[in-house]
Amino acid sequence: MIRTPLRPLARILDARAQGMNPKGIERENLRLRREQARDAGRRRAEWRLLLLAALFFAGYAVIGARMGMLAATPVVESEPYAGEGISGERADVLDRNGRILATNLVTHSLYAEMRYMQDGRRAAHELARIFPDLDEEALARRLTDPDRRFYWIRSRVSPEQAQAAHDIGEPGLWLGPREMRLYPNGTLAAHVLGGTAYGQQGVTAAEIQGVAGLEYTADDRLSDPDLADVPLSLSLDLGVQSIVEEVLGSGIQMLHARAGSAIIMDAQTGEVVALASAPTFDPNDRPAPPTEGDPADSPLFNRAVQGLYELGSVMKAFAVAQALDLGLVTPQTMVNTRGPLRIGRFEINDFHDYGAQLSVEDVFVHSSNIGTAHLAQMIGPERQRDFLRQFGFLEALPIELPEARRALPQYPDRWTEVSAMTISYGHGLAVTPMHLAAAYAALVNGGTMVQPTLLRRPDTTPGPRVISPETSRIMRSLFRQVVTRGTASLGEVAGYGVGGKTGTADKPNPQGGYYDDRVVATFAGAFPMNDPRYVIIVTMDEPQETVGGVERRTAGWTVVPVAAEMVRRIAPVMGMRPQDPAVIDAELRLR
């Protein structure tokens, strides 16, 4: 029984009357009240803990349920930037031996989603450290622009850059997977491959499009999803291409030339085994096309198929071949070489005085302009024009490069007698080195035209006949003599029977006439000349060699040694064994 507190006097007296101690009763009452209060507080605390635990449990349950929903639901990106329907697949490009020239590599893009951006200025500062070419202030303005939802920072980043961007820890910076085009050999065969760029882009995919070279011409084939696993095989030989580019580059540097090009072509099939143009570029980091100045000054300019040049004396081969094929002359026919040769107000001279006359054989071997002009007179303008048309000199070449299709040869509107004479020794008709390669293949392969190609072509149908097999045989002998006793004596490569023709043409002056001290030097030939397998064309723009204190610009002193070095190095790579020079020359001796 709980006792009630005593009243001050009455209860004290009452307690004493009953024999109890009032103080003890009061202490007991106080103790009981404290226990009651303590029990009530404990019950309230227990209820509070239960309520707090229930709230925590409910909160965690909601978070867990939301996380489960997010994990089970596929990510939906912002519709304007998604990659649905965009294919980045692209077939590999291989050389003739299966070595990779172009392939795809998985990489990332870097972009910003403003709705998630926490600190745009900090992000811009950190990104500028990763990408030094970025304008930090301009980027900061874009990343903090409240009206902007999305911004491309980089369409392609390296794995190292992607990791560094991720480490910034900014929720508004996103990395999107995509494929990029990779050229593992750098500048090698750059002018053949051309390059690619991104077309339609999304954050998870980007369309790779060819913008130049073979990547452009074969774009539909390379981007066909059904053929993504079927590589495109080219006629190029990576080993030969590497040697040709190295030797050409060294030659240009040594001869202080402005530029140059080189072509190695199968004389029977027209397959281009190597094509080089210098200066060059890296298709992995393709420069922008020039917007002003001379396009030929750009490293993107493919001099082998775009450069239109008056090629000089290498064109004499066609005047001689036509005169022989028409039966107008034989190699021993004597031709007037007394100079100068005057036609109206025009005057034709030789580099050396060859006397009153030379045989057709020696006109070609010693490169007489006057003698060749007399042959052109015998042929006549109409027949000459028709003959050169058969060799493809009057139209663009149908090779698999878009740049070549825009290179239209330049020739006179009126093909007069004077035009025929100057064209016979390489002035007045501007063509590309690739035109010359295809035409020289026909001169040495027995007389049938070939169509130049950059694609692997194991089986070919012979082209139309342009000269007789006998004329081709005579031309092979004359080409060989140019090397053994003529203007290309520095082109001899023991055991490989090199033959060809030199050409040194004064460059046209845009103001009119020709420069006195600027030339285009060319060597056009084939090897081995007793059974021609490959045509070689080397052209340099403004080469110059100093010998004994004398400046020399002619092809015999400049491009011929470069061509010889190419043959010396590529012939073994192409599986060719040296032959006995006496046997080669015996087979080529004119009967």
Stretch-by-stretch model annotation:
Residues M1-P289, L308, L326, E382-L394, ...:
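Periplasmic/cell-envelope proteins involved in peptidoglycan metabolism and beta-lactam response
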Residues L30-R33, A102, A262, A267-S313, ...:
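Beta-lactam-recognizing serine transpeptidase/beta-lactamase-like catalytic domain environment
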